[in-house]
Amino acid sequence: MSRKIHGGSVVEMQGDEMTRIIWELIKEKLILPYVELDLHSYDLGIENRDATNDQVTKDAAEAIKKYNVGVKCATITPDEKRVEEFKLKQMWKSPNGTIRNILGGTVFREAIICKNIPRLVTGWVKPIIIGRHAYGDQYRATDFVVPGPGKVEITYTPKDGSQKVTYLVHDFEEGGGVAMGMYNQDKSIEDFAHSSFQMALSKGWPLYLSTKNTILKKYDGRFKDIFQEIYDKQYKSKFEAQKIWYEHRLIDDMVAQAMKSEGGFIWACKNYDGDVQSDSVAQGYGSLGMMTSVLICPDGKTVEAEAAHGTVTRHYRMYQKGQETSTNPIASIFAWSRGLAHRAKLDNNTELSFFANALEEVCIETIEAGFMTKDLAACIKGLPNVQRSDYLNTFEFMDKLGENLKAKLAQAKL
C-alpha cells in the first residue's frame, strides 16, 4: 500500500492481562500500518480503573456516545481474590455492565466460522447471532426466603395517588419457601426491539424473538406485543424489501429449531435465556475464542465491539514467567474489524470497509490454511494428541496474520 486509508474517529479501550498484550500487537501489526485513525484511547486496565475510581470507564462510554464507534479489549471484573491481588479500593463493577448501562442497547454474540474447525453441532454452517436483553427480569429481581406460613403479595402504588392494586402471589399455609418479584420496563423492551431489528437489517438475516408467553401471559406477552407493534409500524416494509422476516417463537420450540437449523438468523432472547443460550451456542460452534460480541444501540448508529471471552489469565501467568503461550487473538481482531466496518458504514468509506473485510478474510484464510493457535489445533485433534508442530505461539501467529494481510492488501492495490 502506498498510503494509509483514512479511518476517522474510533474510541479504543485497553484491557487486562494476556488480551492487553495481544491488543497492542493487533494495533501494531494489523491496524495502524494501514489505517490512519483518530484514536480516542482509554485505559480500562484494572489499575487505572482503580486509580480513577472507575471514572475512566464512564468517560469511555461517553466518548463512544459522541463518536459512535468503540472497540474494547477484554477486562478483569474483580472478585474478592482480584481485590486482594491488586489492592483495589473496592470491588469495581463490570466495565461492560457500566458501558451498557450508559449506552443502552443489546449485546449480540456471533461465532466466527472456519471450515476446518469442527463444530459440536455439525449442521451449523452459518452463525447464529444471539441478542440478549441485558436488563431487568431475574437480574434485577427482589428474591427472599419465606420463613414460615403467611401470604406473599405484590402491591402496585400509582404515583397519581389513585387506588393501590394488590396481587396475591402465594398463601404459604404449611411452612415457608421462596418468593421473588421481578420487572422490566416498556422503554427497555422497545430499545431491545429496535436494536434487534437493526441488527437483522444490517446482516440481512431473519429475526426470531423467543418467550414463554403461554405461561407468563402478561409478562412475556408484553415483550411479544411490543416487538410486533414496532415491527408492523417501522420495520415490516424494510424486512420485506430484503426478503427477510420477523417471527415470535416459544422458547422451547426455538431451542429445538436452533439445534436442527443450519444457522443464519438473529435470535432475540430475554435476559436469562440470553445468558444461558449464548454460552450454549458458543460451545456448539466449538470455541469462545472464536466469538465476537457487539453492543448495538437502539439508534442503529452507535456500536461497541469486543471479544466475547475474558483476559486469558492462565496464559498471562505463563507469559509473566517467560514461558511460551499460544493465545487465540481472533475474537479481539474481529472487535477491531467490526468496529472499523461500522465506522466505514457511517462515513460511507469504501476503502475502510474493504480493509475491515480483508482483515476478517485473512484471519479465516490463515486458519483454514493450517496456521493456528493451540486451542484451535485441540478442537481439530483433541488436546492430548496436539504436538508442538500443530500450532504457532502467540507472536508467531500474529506475525503470520501480519504477513498474510500485507500480501492481501498489496494484491488489492489499495
Swiss-Prot record:
Assembly description: Homodimer.
Enzyme class: oxidoreductase
Organism: Rattus norvegicus (Rat)
Gene name, Swiss-Prot/TrEMBL: Idh1
Source taxonomy: Eukaryota, Metazoa, Chordata, Craniata, Vertebrata
GO MF term set: identical protein binding; isocitrate dehydrogenase (NADP+) activity; magnesium ion binding; NAD binding; NADP binding; protein homodimerization activity
Positions carrying Phosphotyrosine: 42
Binding-site positions, substrate: 77, 94-100, 109, 132, 212
Protein name, UniProt field: Isocitrate dehydrogenase [NADP] cytoplasmic
Tissue/organ expression: Ubiquitous.
